[in-house]
């Protein structure tokens, strides 16, 4: 398995042979024997060199994981588990990562000098197994009922906009007034009706925005450009709320909070690297007023 992983990582038999300190014929023979045993072609030749086939990519991800877990077991047996090594692939929404993960990475990476990290930043939900992701930080409801997830926090949602926008459009005095406002809608976020609650009563409102964007950063930019108001998590506008660039309204009404989850790939045990990083993030955000700490582990459900 290690030989195959090195070939995929380097893109050639010769480079893998140099890294493994063996001859190129030995590498070629090992791969041929592996393909014969599995009964599938694992590698294809292209202008970029050797690339894994669809079956090869599936085998590569599992083989890489097995090698990493074996290395971690060796470290644990020798009492060296604190020194995490290898590559940790983390997925998160770009805005959340920029505001709440990246600023905290120095301490984590400083504690694990042998560890490398890759951040896959995308507002869309990606296939963690296909992308080789160790852990993903997701907001809101989880659709994958087979995924293993840990809830790290629940953050409040508010209606907000800039003082300049409200100076022109006026501040809403109740949820029903939102129908008369320009709304910025996040198409990758929560959709549908919003239930506002106050003193036992409930008002349901659907935002009808003319401006829709697929990214949280697009929502932030549009709101800060005075184009309208939005319903958003306070973590998403933490710097702007602190500086007064945006202001919340309808604060005597409450909206459903939004959960922050750490999600692990389906069918895999969480690696020591992933568990350590999730523990670190959970501790780091425990005092964040925009992400009220509320750590709960469970299987993700609808």
Feature annotation, model-predicted:
Residues 146-157, 161-184, 199:
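Flexible hinge/capping segments at coil-to-helix
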């Amino acid at each position: 398995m290690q030989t195959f992983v090195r070939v995929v990582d380097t893109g050639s038999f010769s480079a893998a042979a140099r890294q493994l300190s063996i001859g190129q014929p030995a590498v070629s023979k090992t791969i041929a024997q592996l393909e014969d045993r599995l009964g599938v072609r694992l590698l294809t030749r292209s202008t970029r060199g050797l690339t894994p086939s669809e079956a090869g990519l599936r085998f590569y991800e599992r083989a890489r994981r097995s090698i990493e877990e074996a290395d971690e077991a060796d470290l644990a047996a020798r009492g060296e588990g604190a020194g995490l090594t290898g590559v940790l692939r983390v997925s998160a929404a770009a805005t959340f990562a920029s505001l709440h993960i990246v600023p905290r990475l120095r301490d984590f990476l400083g504690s694990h000098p042998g560890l490398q990290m890759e951040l896959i930043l995308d507002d869309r939900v990606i296939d963690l197994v296909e992308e080789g992701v160790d852990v993903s930080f997701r907001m809101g409801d989880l659709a994958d009922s087979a995924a293993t997830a840990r809830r790290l926090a629940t953050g409040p949602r508010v209606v907000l906009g800039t003082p300049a926008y409200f100076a022109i459009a006026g501040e809403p005095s109740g949820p029903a007034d939102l129908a008369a406002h320009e709304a910025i809608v996040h198409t990758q976020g929560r959709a549908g009706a919003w239930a506002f609650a106050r003193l036992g009563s409930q008002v349901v409102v659907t935002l009808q925005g003319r401006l829709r964007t697929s990214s949280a950063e697009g929502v932030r930019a549009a709101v800060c450009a005075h184009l309208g108001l939005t319903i958003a998590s306070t973590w998403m506008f933490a710097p702007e709320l602190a500086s007064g660039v945006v202001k919340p309204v309808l604060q005597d009404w409450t909206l459903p909070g939004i959960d922050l989850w750490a999600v692990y790939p389906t069918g895999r045990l969480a690696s020591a690297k992933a568990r350590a990083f999730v523990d670190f993030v959970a501790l780091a955000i425990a005092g964040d007023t925009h992400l009220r700490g509320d750590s709960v582990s469970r299987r993700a459900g609808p």
